[in-house]
Amino acid sequence: MQITHYLPTTPVSKPLTKNKQISARQIAFAAAFLLPAAKFLEAPSILSKHAGGDLLLPAIVHFLLQTLVILAVLYAASQSKTPLIHHLKSVAGKAVYPVYALYALYFLFSAILPLLDAEKFVYAAYFDTAPTLFSFGVFFLFSAFVCTKGIKAIGRCADLCLFLFLIPFLALSFMAFSQTDFSRLLPLFGTRLAKSASAFTHSTPHFSDGVLLLPLIANLEYKEKDGAKIVAGYGFGALLTLFFLAVFYALFGSLAGREHYAFIKIGQYFPALSVVGRIDLVFVYFLSVVLLFYTCLPLQYTTQAVCTILKTERKTLVSALLNLALLVFVLFFNRHYNTIYNLISGKLTPVFWLFANIFPVLVLFLPKQPKSKQKPQNTPPRYALKPKNRGDYTQKGGR
């Protein structure tokens, strides 16, 4: 009796969703609900000090500039057949390691002000008496743990920030709204252009955070409409920040330049607090968690870059050494905050323009990937017969 053999057809493999490094939705959430958190500490008072009622103008220019940078990187990602980081490695080869080294140093440099701001914020918000020398040291334990995690962990944190950020933001804005006077923002363009330019320059370290999205975009398996989602997320975060700045100045007016750590103060003027107590602190706690995630983000990138350069998987050791060094730095240099801030936001401002605005745009000049001439490996031979029952690859017929 003739025996007929059926050859199975091999299905084309597809990337599993659960194995993706990060999704466009998570990057959009990071842009909308994670990046704005750090702008609620010192940025409002700095903009108010230099630009007065026109504090929104330099902020808008910052957001437009960062949006152009993000659009450039997204366009490069859309033209790449693989995640942008793989394309960069294939083009640059070993030359990619100096790029990693430069950005590891930049992310470490850009984390200095957020670290010092976070320390002062914690002391001002949560300590009624003078804190001990190591009170802020707990943060570095948290940071050392977070820095050992990969891109997936950042995506999960972004998902959490949807609730940790948006609900407290709306609640605190509502508490302050009854005491605001938006006429304090008038007249529009009433500040001299030189002062607005000064506000733009001094606030550059606080608004040059679009670069924090670039490692996420570089690891994204780009699909259609991913760019629109990410840009929409960044735009939504920008609108929330602009609204907060308007509420802040409408609340404090000419005194806004002296009011530091804005989001812990705007809720204090809610009339019902005398009856229900300081419920505004509950929302401040939630925003503080988002602030911790944000502060850890550049340190996490630095850890990943150092491990890549050294070709080691000992992230725990690298993270521990990095955070120990930062703890020592904060302990010894926090008393020189004003000097460090004036240096970074003054003479060292071009560092942010170079690494956050100029270098990322260079990905537009990456050569395109050549088209593969190889035939698909998973294509079944023409003579293969499809079995009647799926998975039935046994012999047909009896003996």
What are these regions (language model features)?
Residues 21-43, 58, 62, 66-69, ...:
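Hydrophobic, membrane-embedded alpha-helices of multi-pass small-molecule transporters
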Residues 251-280:
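Membrane-interface interhelical connector segments
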Residues 133, 146-176, 346-359:
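Membrane-interface loop-to-helix entry segments
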Residues 108-111, 115, 147, 163-189, ...:
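Hydrophobic alpha-helical segments and their helix-loop junctions in multi-pass secondary transporters
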Residues 49, 81, 120-123, 141-161, ...:
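Membrane-water interface regions at transmembrane-helix termini and the short interhelical loops
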Residues 40-132:
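Membrane helical hairpin/interfacial module
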Residues 310-317, 331-352:
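Extracellular/periplasmic helix-loop-helix junctions in multi-pass membrane proteins
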Residues 1-44, 51-53, 219-220, 366-399:
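Membrane-interface "cap" regions at the ends of multi-pass membrane proteins
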